[in-house]
Amino acid sequence: MALLSEELSSILPNPDFDDEEEDYVERETSHADERQIGVKFHIPPYGQRKGWFPSSPEDFGDGGAFPEIHVAQYPLDMGRKRSAKSAGNTLALQVTSSGAVDYNAIARQGHEHGELVQASFRDLIPLRARLGVGEISLEKPSDEQKQEVANKTKLALQKILSKQIAQSQPKSAVVQQRDDPVYIRYTPSNQMGQALSKQRIIKMVTAEQDPMEPPKFRHKKVPRGPPSPPPPVLHSPPRKVSAQEQQDWQIPPSISNWKNPKGYTIPLDKRLAADGRGLNDVEINDGFAKFSEALYTVERQAREEVRYRAIMRQKMAEKEKQEKEQRLFMLAQKAREDRMGRNAASSGPSHAKPRSTSVSSEERSRSRAGSFSHHSESENEDEDSEAFRRRQELRRERRRQAEKDLRLSRMGAEKRAKLAEKDRPRDVAERVALGLSKPSMSSDTMIDSRLFNQASGLGSGFQDEDSYNVYDKPWRAAPSSTLYRPGATLSRQVDASAELERITSESRYDVLGNAHKKFKGSDEVVESRAGPVTFEKDIADPFGVDTFLNNVSSKKT
């Protein structure tokens, strides 16, 4: 027998399974289960069950409840309603070989058996750094293993493809597959004391099916179930979120600038926050500030120089005015002295002229004091008093004119325009339209002699044949009779040469074409013109501001 077993062992291949090894594995598994059960389902003895409640069917053992524990108990699910939903995803508590609770089952729930799931810190350690790395074989697989894996992969792919091809085919079309007939030997049994029948051979064939027959059942598409949860990725434990992080993660709602169908009242800060413009950082170039500062500096310098020029111009005008007044004063004084000298020469002899002049001045001063009076001194005093009155009248006229100018400067624009329109000289057409040139209504001008029965009327031929005048009387005869007639106030004893000079120098008709007031110095500039009218060309920069700015900019550059 020993030789036979040795020969058989040499001929037969090595066994894949060993009974002794299986017995050893079964014993280890049973011990582990007993240890697991002992740890997992520990029931305290009677009398020490205060605070303990059965939570799983294993707590009841073979059956039977605990009467001293007053809770709802269902030993072996007896008395539980079948319609009630089961626990579902509840997992049974498991322990490791050391007795600790195994939480890896929670991570592996919903995954296939061979899928790699990181469930502990040990899974994160590389293989080369783990303990017992030498026990793991890192050799390449053999050809048999490669072929076996390839066959499994091929079968899996064929299964998937066949399923997809079957789904793509139409469901309504019936394709009958003819199978080979099956022959069955049928032997009837003896029933109710009947005689045995003979054996028969039955031929079973597939029943014919109408291909145009509509389907008998309604196929419903079952919705796809939820996918398996992704494997967990180990990360740091969660921490409390700060208020700043919550504010950063807060996303404002989308607010339209055009539509508000609900009619909500949205604050301006929320509307601006939804716009997103405040998130952009606005960067302002320094060149703008430098450019603005340079412009401000140049403008200030230009204003200062313009102000200085205006002050200098004002001072020069005042100085010129003072010089003119001084010159006029000197001319007036010289004329007064000349007049006084002529009066003294006409009253006394020619050889006593200087003495009489000096005496007249002394006597005039004495007459003001009230010492005595003389004929020549009285005449000089009369002339001085008349000149003084004229000067006083001129001063009053200037004062009235200054007051009028002051009132005009304080008037509004509309009132000043009305006053200027009122003072402006009107032509004949405007005066006729306004009724200002209406003649005095006399009895002679209100009637027409042609309407009466008289010898010179229309009945007698109106007038002579050789006369061409249309009207019997001139128009506005009363005013025209006094236009060029000298007034009664004029003195009859007038020097002819002096009167002629006065009439020629008088600007009597300037009001018809010129303004009442002229610009200062316009009389000196007026020159006699010969030929066509000439115009002055406009000056582009009368005050030289553009030239000054160009010079300043050229100096800076």
Curated annotation (Swiss-Prot):
Pro residues bias (residue ranges): 224-235
GO biological process: mRNA cis splicing, via spliceosome
Keywords: mRNA processing, mRNA splicing, Nucleus, Phosphoprotein, Spliceosome
Comp. bias (Basic and acidic residues): 316-327, 386-430
Leader sequence segment: none
InterPro entries: SKI-int_prot_SKIP, SKI-int_prot_SKIP_SNW-dom
Intracellular or extracellular location(s): Nucleus
One term under GO cellular component: nucleus
Region ranges (Disordered): 1-32, 208-243, 316-444
Function noted in UniProt: Involved in pre-mRNA splicing.
Subunit-structure text: Homodimer. Interacts with cyp1 and the small 23 kDa subunit of the splicing factor U2AF (u2af23).
Protein name: Pre-mRNA-processing protein 45
